[in-house]
């Protein structure tokens, strides 16, 4: 299984929250944000900080995708944001 943060990026675009603003408000490092942009796993504590800022649940920001379906679900974050 792979993780996809597509829902997070869409949520931020809809709320007009920039990457920098979200990072600062959540207290997340740029290195961690880069991992998320690459759909790499991050600590649950990071997800909870972001969820707190966005007033949502961690599950609202991400999906788990089967390995064989992952290539079809991957998006370019810059297209959304």
Label each residue range with its predicted role.
Residues 9, 20, 48, 59:
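Residues within the helices of the helix-turn-helix
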Residues 40-52:
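Short, basic-rich loop-to-helix N-cap that marks the start of a DNA-contacting helix
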Residues 10, 63-81:
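Short, charged recognition helix plus adjacent turn
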